[in-house]
């Protein structure tokens, strides 16, 4: 694997990791849907993993942490755990990638470095899946409730910026992890061993063994 490909894969994975952190912190997973009577509202509601915010038409914003975890929808409860695990897993993958990088001297064996880089790629792929699942789950819940006639219009939401950042983070980590997994251990080259065979010779002119070889020698 070339160093350029390794650096590209690591850079994409790190960028995806940073986007996951932004996705986790943004209080914009769900935003108010301006439909029906809510079009003339003077405030916008944002809902994230850790807090919800109310933005007034004057630009004033008030944010409040959630009082109870159990009061959150199931998709946001699961998203909290999965996103945090994804961030920690990607951070560990970054450390593993640095250990197995060709530009570092933590490991001298090239074969071991390639295997360590593959492990880092797998960790980034797992982190991408852990980010993709909760983001897609939340998006599916928002779309389902939006088209559900039983849900009041005031409670309907649209997809916020946090979900799009999460999808971008998952895509970057998938691409970066896949590039790192392309690191194949170098094949060891063995020189073919030459084995020389010598023809047996007879011990004397009268012996029966090796007469064919004796005749060939005298021709």
UniProtKB/Swiss-Prot annotation:
It comes from the Eukaryota. It is found in: Cell junction, Tight junction; Cell membrane. PROSITE patterns: CLAUDIN (PS01346). Keywords: Cell junction, Cell membrane, Membrane, Phosphoprotein, Tight junction, Transmembrane, Transmembrane helix. Residues 30-80, 137-161 are extracellular. GO terms for molecular function: cell-cell adhesion mediator activity; identical protein binding; structural molecule activity. The modification Phosphotyrosine is found at residue 197. InterPro entries: Claudin (IPR006187), Claudin3 (IPR003549), Claudin_CS (IPR017974), PMP22/EMP/MP20/Claudin (IPR004031). One of its GO terms (biological process) is response to ethanol. This is Claudin-3. It comes from Rattus norvegicus.
